[in-house]
């Protein structure tokens, strides 16, 4: 949803004389003759230079002509001359907004700070002040103004959503969720409703902001041909099953896309053949994870490995993982769409001096089944692996796969929070 800002219009009952034979600059402005209105206001100010309404008219005309910097100067003069608090409040908001339109955000924030220092100014049309602060990229001031819950009654759909994104940027997760949900409710009363895609984007924001706990479970079965580097071992397939789970807890919330989490993880690997070349093992991890960039799904973690049986290991590990893609979640307006996904993961074990790495890229086509909660995705992929503890450290393979994913646990304001997926792959070693 595109951010927008609103500014309430001030209705002035003017007692000033009418200038010019055509009804004066006010009539020119009302008729859309903004150049004439600007010229007329300038002429009038030569004889009535202390009139704040004329300065405001000049400012409005310049704003319509796209001369935002000079419009801001005229609004500044109007606010200096105005004695009425409502008028001063409006003129200062308008000045800040014109500075924003002129690209002078720092100067706009200076005006907002001056208004906050005089509470009687921001007590007038507080919600408008908050929207101007958001436009000026001053989320701290905006959220300070929005501490006054009485202004929420004045929310429109757009102002509620703008306030939500601002609160999210400030790390005020609960407030952001409240505003997002309010915006979705207010959308029901709008003539031009949000599209399905826009509503879903907001529901996904709510999901991310409310997700403090996470649980991942996995069961996998694989067969793989043994490499010739293993010497005398038979060359038939090796069958293995792996079962694992991870639970994590965010500390401090979403942090505007930079969450910090603690986690625990347990995996058990079982080799099913009598001549297995590796022993069964149960391995545990406890650690911390941090996402340092809000716009990039890169996670770094540090953990302690704990052997939970005689074949598990005790060690310290650092790890980095990155992922992304398109078409991973259900899309709207179509029953099928392009799917792409990439994943990279590299970790290092200090005591064992071993590096592990995996990189995989997928491309395919996703098909929605039923009510869009179930997605079938055939895809092709390329996969690379690294294990410095092996004789042949690197590997490269490619193949095809089929994934069936069912999403569940959604509400009117929160997107699907969980899924179950069945994924089968066939791949051939390339190198």
Please report, for each region that a protein language model flagged, where it lies by residue.
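Bacterial N-terminal signal peptides that target proteins for export
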Residues: 1-7
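Bacterial N-terminal signal peptides
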Residues: 7-15
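Sec/Tat signal peptide C-region and signal peptidase I cleavage site
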Residues: 16-20
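Transmembrane beta-barrel domains of bacterial outer-membrane proteins
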Residues: 56-57, 127, 135, 156-172, ...
